[in-house]
């Protein structure tokens, strides 16, 4: 399971690529499964590469994190933004059911994270987190949940430019 966050009104620098042709997916007769039509596969693959490039260039449009990375990040954000986010935000942000975090809140999250990054707090927290993880038994599931300053920085940029976001 992963968490896909979509900016609701992202600040964009370039136009978003759009697929203007018919639905590229077909259902195969033999297996009865959905796949990309072989006649448009190469063109659709190129389109998807452009989509990913656009997402990378427009930081507020999309943020993704697998469950292992998301949980420590979201827990950290909720702790350091406890006067910004509600307990409902914390609970619903731990699920990927389309919950929304407003533009006002995401701007405040970004501002707080930026201050904590610039002050060195996030780096110190990362060191503490890794030290505590190192004390865990190898069989402890919590050992599989990483945390990094780089991930916080990426999330801060997304929050700053997302215009609010939905969690899927």
State what each model feature region is.
Residues 1-168:
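Acidic (Asp/Glu-rich) sequence patches and key acidic residues
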């Amino acid at each position: 399971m992963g968490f896909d966050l979509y900016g609701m009104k992202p600040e964009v620098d370039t136009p978003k690529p759009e697929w203007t042709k018919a639905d590229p997916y077909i259902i195969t007769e033999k297996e009865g499964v959905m796949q990309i039509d072989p006649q448009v596969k190469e063109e659709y693959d190129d389109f998807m590469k452009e989509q990913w490039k656009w997402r990378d260039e427009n930081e507020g449009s999309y943020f993704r994190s697998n469950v292992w990375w998301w949980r420590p990040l979201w827990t950290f954000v909720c702790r350091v933004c406890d006067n910004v986010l509600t307990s409902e935000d914390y609970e619903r942000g731990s699920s990927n059911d389309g919950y929304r975090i407003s533009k006002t809140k995401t701007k405040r999250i970004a501002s707080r994270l930026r201050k904590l990054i610039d002050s060195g707090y996030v780096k110190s927290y990362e060191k503490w987190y890794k030290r505590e993880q190192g004390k865990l038994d190898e069989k402890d599931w919590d050992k599989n949940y990483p945390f990094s300053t780089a991930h916080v920085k990426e999330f801060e940029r997304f929050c700053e430019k997302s215009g609010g976001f939905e969690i899927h």
